[in-house]
């Protein structure tokens, strides 16, 4: 049972067309309704319809690239098809990186050309020999990405000098707080674990993610175990896991509870059911875009936990070069801006800022690179301590 943080925020922007500035209707599929239509149209033929392999060649010379990915990627379909001559995208929407891996490992890698799982799943695809190395001659936008994501690739899924995935968009976890009740303070995980860190009574006013993959790393960073977070996988010792378990159990009397992300988090926060919440940035961006100017999100000084969606190409694809051409388009400024707007998540290409308004840039545009340096990428637990890791979380929840 390796960690799989699929329950991060994948929020679709349902703003009206009047407020969708900076990306034209002519260039992109406008609105969540059109995105859903395009996505589910792709779903109807995601496996080639007749069981054929992915990346089929049509009778008119059109190459169809079959993709399993998150719903918002349909926002780029129209523009990519108009940019790449003779290429048609067939998009199957998914809500789970684990689902993507399970499908490919059960034989559907022959039915898809591209998947876009969370970064922590890419090593599993690699270990199962399901993915092809990046074609650097084709993915010429790779060098335009933030340096931090290029280093994440080197650290997490590069073997024998070959990278096996391209980061597309990202987000990170820290905590949110209600600025009407919680005073300004230096961002720190201390607020989650120490009674007197701020001048506010937070007993029963804190929530944590109901997921080991997010709550255990938060406790680890508070305890200064950043070395265990720095490799390709989390490498806690059993003694460290025992210390983490003790901390999380001691914290429980301060908690309002454990909570799922996205709509549940937002609903509970708006109902004032907690004041401080371990959370992703996306939830706060959505709330602020909808008028909740009292909510603040911060990245703790000890380090934030970053996720990033990573495009991979099936080793079984008959159209690898075309698939990499499509992935290269995912991180162009125009397409990256459309995807950022659709899901409130920044592109790994900072040049998207040129395609967004000032207001959009504040929410999901260019990020100061220095802010990325203190982030640790989300990753699986090392196999030799996986059993102890799972047991740690089970003991915390049962206490």
Could you say what each language-model-derived stretch is?
Residues 1-158, 162-167, 172, 179-203, ...:
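Terminal disorder- and signal-encoded targeting elements
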Residues 212-221, 225-230:
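Loop-centered beta-sheet repeat module
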